[in-house]
């Protein structure tokens, strides 16, 4: 560092918010409102079929200490939508402070949302606090997946220091349907070789299907949980299906996630997943 280079904690922090509202107009799902500011963007690519696709993007290229990022999607009554992220999110060394990500989606009565963000990659000394909430109206449902990768195996990265807190929850009528907290820190990483933590694995994902018929999808989901290099299990109860996956690296995990999503959705993944 020299006189022309400010210390890391003095650098400007990234802030962004993107919000999309969909509504049914004359029998079709239409964009009713779009608001975006700072580093957060949202766009609706042209798709084949009646279900719109929303792609959220963090233009800052990654997250570091003090950054603030939020995405919000409102899916109107009787509407269906698919939402994802343009690419994997990366949390870099934090310096001072914690990066915060807030995802808040709402699905109106009888609606449906596929929330399919691409994986989050955590780097050494990263500090990230993320909260994802999906609020379901009466008769609404959703499919949600979250994947986390601890460093890049291809680059020989092994993490020993980070602070990651992740809370995912789905509610209906003010009551929790699913609550998934996850916390990883230096102590957890030091114990990560143990079977009770990660068993030496470095990529993990949780998939949740909530809605009518979710329990019926247990058999088809289990039938494809055979990707080499991935440990996975599925269970179904109380109107939801849960699939948990662990892998040595992000690539086999991504392939397994894509296969399960293919079975549950019955159609191709968003194009950004395929690029």
Curated annotation (Swiss-Prot):
UreD, UreF and UreG form a complex that acts as a GTP-hydrolysis-dependent molecular chaperone, activating the urease apoprotein by helping to assemble the nickel containing metallocenter of UreC. The UreE protein probably delivers the nickel. It is found in: Cytoplasm. The gene is ureD. InterPro entries: UreD. Keywords: Chaperone, Cytoplasm, Nickel insertion. Pfam families: UreD. One of its GO terms (molecular function) is nickel cation binding. Its main location: cytoplasm. This is Urease accessory protein UreD. Belongs to the UreD family. Required for maturation of urease via the functional incorporation of the urease nickel metallocenter. One of its GO terms (cellular component) is cytoplasm. It comes from Cereibacter sphaeroides (strain ATCC 17025 / ATH 2.4.3) (Rhodobacter sphaeroides).
